[in-house]
């Protein structure tokens, strides 16, 4: 509906700032004949939206009309806007399919990281180990990073919940399966998360629930 109303706007950049399946921006641009539509994935967290926006570690802009080696007009216009307001934040331009994949990749990796450290925590419980001491030793390796290693998590529960991680993990599983790529890793992450997690707070979000899931 919004794009129908903006269909005749040919001068200004129209930015889709959301997490959408790979190919969505390209399909919408084709459907509504919008040369000026770009995709900019959202990296905000619900708890710290304002802080995350002002202190972003990167901005990603994707155009459905980008050609390898050629700068596309509208993604460059969007890039200039961000650089003018946030000169110190790096901006990455790419195709819209690539920018859509960036967000899914980041969220699925972090969900996998949460699942991995929950697994280590559970094993430590069985073996009588102190998780925090184990974690301190592991995190001395700078390649690993502290984020998403707390067990239980910030909400006091195990695994991951909310809307983003469950939705994006399941969307990626579907995308992998539709392209005949093994989704075993993410399926294992998801199935284990349902065992670890007490609060299935994603249950009312149809895009975050897989078929035949029951408690």
Set out the residue ranges of the language-model regions:
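Rossmann-fold NAD(P)-binding glycine/threonine-rich loop
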Residues: 1-47
């Amino acid at each position: 509906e919004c794009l129908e109303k903006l269909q005749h706007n040919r001068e200004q950049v129209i930015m889709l700032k959301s997490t959408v399946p790979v190919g969505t921006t390209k399909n919408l641009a084709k459907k509504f004949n919008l040369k000026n539509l770009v995709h900019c994935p959202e990296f905000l967290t619900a708890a710290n939206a304002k802080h995350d926006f002002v202190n972003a570690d990167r901005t990603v802009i994707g155009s459905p009309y980008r050609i390898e080696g050629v700068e596309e007009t509208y993604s460059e216009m969007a890039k200039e806007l961000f650089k003018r307001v946030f000169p110190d934040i790096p901006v990455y331009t790419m195709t819209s399919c690539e920018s859509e994949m960036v967000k899914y990749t980041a969220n699925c990796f972090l969900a996998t990281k949460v699942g991995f450290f929950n697994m280590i925590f559970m094993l430590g419980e069985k073996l009588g180990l102190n998780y925090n001491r184990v974690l301190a030793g592991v995190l001395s390796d700078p390649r690993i990073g502290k984020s998403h290693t707390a067990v239980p998590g910030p909400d006091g529960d195990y695994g991951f919940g909310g809307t983003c991680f469950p939705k994006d993990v399941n969307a990626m599983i579907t995308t992998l399966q539709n392209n005949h790529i093994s989704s075993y890793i993410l399926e294992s992450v998801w199935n284990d998360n349902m065992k670890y997690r007490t609060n299935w707070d994603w249950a009312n979000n149809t895009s975050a629930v897989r078929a035949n899931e029951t408690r």
